Amino acid sequence: MFCVTPPELETKMNITKGGLVLFSANSNSSCMELSKKIAERLGVEMGKVQVYQEPNRETRVQIQESVRGKDVFIIQTISKDVNTTIMELLIMVYACKTSCAKSIIGVIPYFPYSKQCKMRKRGSIVSKLLASMMCKAGLTHLITMDLHQKEIQGFFNIPVDNLRASPFLLQYIQEEIPDYRNAVIVAKSPASAKRAQSFAERLRLGIAVIHGEAQDAESDLVDGRHSPPMVRSVAAIHPSLEIPMLIPKEKPPITVVGDVGGRIAIIVDDIIDDVDSFLAAAETLKERGAYKIFVMATHGLLSSDAPRLIEESAIDEVVVTNTIPHEVQKLQCPKIKTVDISMILSEAIRRIHNGESMSYLFRNIGLDD
């Protein structure tokens, strides 16, 4: 596993341990690896807690040590059973609140339901609902990483520190891709062009954007709402009004804006889940002359058949961080590589507990990062 260790963090972390408790809210042992890494870096023991499912599938949490007057950090990595994971977190937060914890900080590297942060058709903004539930349960602070949309921070009425994984991914490119200076950074849709531009500018590389039929459906901003069918006897609008309507969208044939011929193509995005759009992008880049294709993403959800499809595709390597456990997927697909980001989460916890500034973790980060 690739790990970045800045020189200033190589020594043992200076942390006041007396008032800090570190919990993992996961009942699934495979989801506790990140928590263990963070605890080891901080030099503290994991707090004693039992999280389990009753025979009737209800979640039960039993905290087995005092949290009164302490800073409680609850680490929750998202498993495949996302709804159970959320309930585990909410119940543990509420248990700490009713046990008189001084502060309750959620460490949620991948914020669930973040894709549902926009209104579509007659749906709802689920990430806003989840933010309200967390605050109501008793969360006083949130540490997360690379939110799908930065505006999600505004859904909370508590402080939110949205850390970035890009420094770790950039260093991976520089150290693990020998000929990276012959690479081009690729956005698989116009929606991810800003992220690609940020990577390209920092690596002093060119950029290419894929536009057309291979676009991800999320880039379509149409909300999709339609009125109920008209009653024939009732006019839709007053006959004297002429309201202009939007012309329907029509995606052009697939196009790559930028030169990728004879180069390494590095596709960057924040989430890799359903891989169809990545596979289509890889095929297009191969047709345009790219001789090697990498995919870099912060959150590797890699749902359903994603590992098998990646293994059979034109993609040479997929690099994701360990915000979400994916050890099983790595066994299915050797092309998947992991970058460890426990270092930055540990440092964020240390700084918040010690009352230090968080600005060090956000230096050189712009609005588009």
UniProtKB/Swiss-Prot annotation:
Residue numbers carrying Phosphothreonine: 5
PTM sites of type Phosphoserine: 219, 227, 233
Functional summary from the UniProt entry: Seems to play a negative regulatory role in 5-phosphoribose 1-diphosphate synthesis.
Pfam families on file: Pribosyl_synth, Pribosyltran_N
Name of the molecule in the record: Phosphoribosyl pyrophosphate synthase-associated protein 2
One MF annotation (Gene Ontology) recorded for this entry: ribose phosphate diphosphokinase activity
GO cellular component labels: cytoplasm; ribose phosphate diphosphokinase complex
Alphabetized InterPro entries for the sequence: Pribosyltran_N, PRibTrfase_dom, PRTase-like, Rib-P_diPkinase
One GO-annotated biological process of the protein: 5-phosphoribose 1-diphosphate biosynthetic process
Keywords: Acetylation, Nucleotide biosynthesis, Phosphoprotein
Protein's organism: Pongo abelii
Family according to the record: Belongs to the ribose-phosphate pyrophosphokinase family.
Modified residues (N-acetylmethionine): 1
Acetylation among keywords: yes
Cross-referenced Gene3D superfamilies: 3.40.50.2020
Subunit text: Binds to PRPS1 and PRPS2.
